[in-house]
Amino acid sequence: VYFTTGPDYMKDIRLVELKDGKIGVFSRPRNEEIEKKYGSSAMIGFAVIDHLEDLTDDVIFNATPIEGIFGKGEWGGCNQAYLLQDGRIGVIGHQSFSQPVEGEEDLAVYVNISFEFDPVTFEVTNQKIIGTRGCYPEGPSKRPNLRDCTFTSGIVMREDGKADLYGGMSDVEEGRITIAYPFSCPLN
């Protein structure tokens, strides 16, 4: 059922129910102001709404950028969000940067990341890389500059306490690897 439209060119809009019943909204603000202020072409933004009907393009567009996830020249987004038992949010996402290669087009490097986010204080903890292109099976690349790219699709929790991490490989195929449970706290 259709219920809203996000801002033009906005990717990585994800929702998560919070401990108090409100809804956390992740977005990916991307504009010249963001790049000038943070040195990153795209950040992860966060806002809280009371009801699904409150989700508008203005809420998504004006979500507060979360600082400290990306360094200068990096960008990324939230691909999946889980409420943790302690009220924080476990996030699976992607982190990206361009890597110069002599005599070639710069590589677009995308890695799979996880971190824990406090929706009250905006503190980011336990941030780590959970997968890179080299962790996945070998395969073709759509273009040479995408050979080191794995775009995070999401994770599926397993009964053995691990997780299956899915990622788009070099813009051509989908792969799966098994990783340790990425968060320091159980899911709610």
Language-model-derived ranges and their functions:
Residues 1-11, 16-73, 83-145, 158-162, ...:
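Beta-rich carbohydrate-recognition and catalytic domains
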